[in-house]
Amino acid sequence: MLKLYDNGIYLVHGETICSCPEEAAQKSGITTTKEEAAKGTMAYGILKAHNQSNDMDQLRLKFDSMTSHDITYVGIIQTARASGMKQFPLPYVLTNCHNSLCAVGGTINEDDHKFALSAAHKYGGIYVPTNMANIHSYNRETMAGGGRMILGSDSHTRYGALGTMAVGEGGGELAKQLVGRTYDFARPQVIAIYLTGKPRAGIGPHDVALSICGAVYKNGYVKNKVMEFVGPGVANLPIEFRNAIDVMTTETTCWSSIWVTDEQTQRYFMVHGRPEAYKKLAPADVAYYDGCVYIDLDTVESTIAMPMHPSNTYTIHELQANAADILHAVQEEANKQIKGAKMDLDSKFHDGAVWVDQGEIAGCAGGTFDNICAAADILRGKSCGNGVFTLSIYPGSMPALAELYKNGRASDLVNAGAIMRECFCGPCFGAGDCPANGEFSVRHTTRNFPNREGSKPGEGQMSSVALMDARSIAATAANGGKLTAATDLDVEYTNPEYHYNASLYEKRVYNGWGKAEPDAELRFGPNIKDWPEMPALTNDLLVKVCSYITDPVTTTDELIPSGETSSYRSNPERLSEFALSRRDPQYMGRSKEMRAIERDREAGKALPEEVMKVYEALTKAGVANDPANTDIGSTIFANMPGDGSAREQAASCQRVMGASANFAKQYATKRYRSNCINWGMTPFLVENPEVFELGDYIFVPSIREAVLENKASFSAYAVKPDGTVTEFPVSTGALTEAERQIIADGCLINYYRNNQ
């Protein structure tokens, strides 16, 4: 059973749910108010400890440590350098788990890694060499701790099960911490995730996590809020089970997460040689939550998230019973969004069963020691077969892999036909094991967004991914690719004890925290480029709509693809050539044209006839304008852009290509909106986007004044090619004083330069 409460709840002694303060007082003997009880959540206490101001409604946070991987750290360090950073003021972990296998671009990936090593020496960072660990496994093992906060430039920065509130954000927010500034954010609501019962044999963390995603994503129940895991069911989940659920909270669009801690949490830290990192965390005797998700773990079934989102969930038995109908419905819904090649799922149902072509167990969600051992228990003595189906396994860290070799589980998997791979995040973001054209992959990874597995629809390629737990993937492998729920097999799960070998990191990881070498030289490869100059916001703004996307949600993978293009993230100009390339291939040319026009304007050259006709139409409609002194840029419209990755490049690539704004009905995540702001793009909100369309111009007079004065709403004007001018209201939503100035200055780097 999974139930969403319509209203807030009071939790008494961490176990009893009450609907009102009177009931809570009766059960607890404590009289309180909603406002006072809200201070009883674990989240409130951690946020208060990290808040640098006395205002708990408008937070100004500093974090205990930060972390980035090799497709984000170059841009962050470059931004911080340009903003005046001299050394890292807090521990900063730089991992190399994304561009560590692909040979795209020759030396450029390894050039980035060597840049990071040199930065760790110069500024005092922590450098984790290639394939030693994925980013989140390493931070769980070495950095998380009770009551701490960690900021990461990866959306799946989540260590709540270890008592750490972790937040994934775009690079600009990390750069702020590196120059001694704060993370400014209105205090989020807190939602109780109340667990009871115990999962059946064969049920794994992805079954629980996907069930939650399916229940809360579309209705926005936890959007930009904190998910606080409580209830008696928590004690029935091993720590790695909790970790693997926790990392998937990102897919609900929540802001962060936190769990109660217990003896199992304490043992985790003892095993990893850090007993001091443990802290007992629990809600106060009476705590108020703004909502509640009630989950009976006894009732969770083997679950699958069909293409193209982790929330598109069915039980495996439900899919099996209605295979032809569900496969066809998913296929047709996907093909409404996809441009180019089409998805084929109809052919995956034959001989009375659903058949898949590939299985992947990988990374921070799937590649935990417990998950891989469970897969080994299922596959021991069996065979994946010599047909189309393949199975690859990517452990989360080298210590986990070493223990899998030592206890024989890796041998069990290899003997069954699985391939043991490096500690690499590739299958999660399109840089590893892209299926063949037309194939259907099942993966214990974090996401199955359109083409995130690496296919290129513009080149006639289309493959598809569903998410499943490692146990059901192993069960499917044991049946040669025939979709199988792990609960349908009779398996004796051995649950072997884990032994952590810290010496593997001690031998290879460079820990320069507190040992900065200011005279050390940064090592630049030929692909590592500085950020280009960004113009400040002029008083008026003219933008051309260069992409108009009507999908319900637009992901960051669509805004800037991952996979092989990630190798160019150290080169802003080159990477920007891929902006929207899989979703709207013509966007790049349209936006580039507007960038060229703006550069000509800045140089004092005449504006092209098309733009002058726009100004003539505005003048005719009585709208004052000043063409010579008005910034000209591009923009996109999307109903709800920014679901998914924290990658700042989803915004920066638009900006480099000449974008000055986004228009949306709402923004999918706080982190994407923050990325737009930090790169100087005004995040407009519009209620009636039908007033403009692709190719129209939008003129926003006095935009600089409106932003700086924090006006709630102001006018914009849509100008069509025939000269029709339509006035419509726009707003920016809430902006902090710093955010308003960042937009006015043109980007975060300009803001810091202007304030040095």
Question: Which residues does each PLM region occupy?
Answer:
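Fe-S-dependent hydro-lyases/dehydratases of central metabolism
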Residues: 1-756
